[in-house]
């Protein structure tokens, strides 16, 4: 588990590292822990099944979740946060906030159909 607070800032790529979809990055500093994006993996059925495997990062200790923009590969798994024990605020622009309900509904439909 990546729940320790580091002595200096660390960045851990949890998705979209060497690939395009599934954006998720953990930023840890001595002052807090922030997840940047929590997106869907898309492509093959095997890729999409990866959406069911969530990294063990101590979700209940996350201080904030930042959504960079309203594409499912960046925000498609935001709806999982309460189930993971994460009650951190989700921070984004107003335009992204306005689009999130529609994007998350679409994300849920994609997951139900394909996985």
Where are these regions (language model features)?
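A short acidic-Thr-Gly-centered motif at the start of a beta-strand
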Residues: 3-4, 25-27
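Extreme N-terminal starter segment of soluble prokaryotic enzymes
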Residues: 7-12
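Pre-active-site segment of Zn-dependent metallo-hydrolases
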Residues: 17-22, 29-67, 71-88, 92-98, ...
């Amino acid at each position: 588990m990546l729940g320790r607070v580091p002595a200096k800032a660390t960045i851990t790529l949890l998705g979209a590292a060497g690939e395009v979809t599934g954006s998720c990055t953990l930023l840890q500093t001595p002052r807090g822990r922030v997840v940047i994006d929590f997106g869907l993996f898309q492509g093959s059925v095997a890729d999409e099944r990866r959406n069911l495997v969530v990294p063990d990062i101590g979700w209940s200790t996350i201080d904030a979740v930042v959504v960079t923009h309203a594409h499912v590969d960046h925000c498609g798994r935001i709806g999982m946060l309460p189930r993971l024990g994460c009650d951190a605020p989700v921070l984004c622009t107003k335009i992204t906030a306005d689009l999130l309900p529609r994007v998350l509904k679409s994300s849920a439909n994609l997951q139900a159909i394909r996985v």
